Amino acid sequence: MDGVANTPEKMERYIKTIYNKSNEMDRLINELTFYSKMDTKKIPYTFNKISVTEFFDDCAEDLQTELGAKNVEFYYSNYVEPEVTVIADAEQIKRVVNNIVSNSLKYTDSDKPKKINLRVKDVGDFIQVEIEDNGKGIAAKDLPNIFDRFYRTDASRNSSKGGSGIGLSIVKKIMEDHGGKVWATSKEHTGTVMYFVLRKYQEVPVNE
C-alpha cells in the first residue's frame, strides 16, 4: 500500500475497509450455502429449550459491540420474565436477528445518525421480537413482497448496497420452520419495524 496508505490514519482506514469487505463476503457465502440447503430441505436445525432473556441479552451484547464500531446507536429493552423459555435453534434465531439488522443498516439515511432498537416482549403464548430502524422506510406497495427471494425495493436497487437479496427470505423460512412468523410495518422517510414471534415453551402436566 506504499503511496496509497501513506499515513497511519489512511492505513487504519484501509485495513478497516478490507476487514469489513471480508466479513461481508463471509456472510454472503454463508447465506448462499444456507439458501442451497433451503431448496433441498436439508437445513440442520438443532432445537433446544433456551432462555429468552439469556439468549437476547447475549444478542444485544454482540450487537452493541458490532454496531458501536459502525457508529450506530443501539437500544435494547427486554420485557420478558427471566424464567420464560422457547424451543428453538439458537444459532438460526441469531441468524434471523443478524439478517434483519444487516438489512436495516443497508437502507438507513446517510445524513442522520443511524439507530437500531431491539425490543423483546411477552404477548400471551408467544414472545414477540421487534427490531426498529430509522431508515428510509419501505413503500406500501413493496411491503408485502420484502420476504420474497431476490426481491428488492425501489430504494434498494443501487448495487452499492451489496447483499444477496435472500437475507429476508431466509428469515421467513427459519421462522416458518420454528412454527412462528415474521412481518413488518414501515413508514417512508421514518423507518421500519420488523417483527417475529416464537411460541413459549410450556410444560405439559403428566397425569399420574
Regions found by a protein language model. Give the residues of each.
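Short beta-strand/loop element within the Bergerat-fold HATPase_c
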Residues: 115-125
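Conserved micro-motifs of the catalytic ATP-binding
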Residues: 40-45, 83-88
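Short helix-loop "hinge" at the ATP-lid/N-box region of the Bergerat-fold HATPase_c
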Residues: 104-105
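A conserved beta-strand-to-alpha-helix junction within the catalytic ATP-binding
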Residues: 46-64, 120
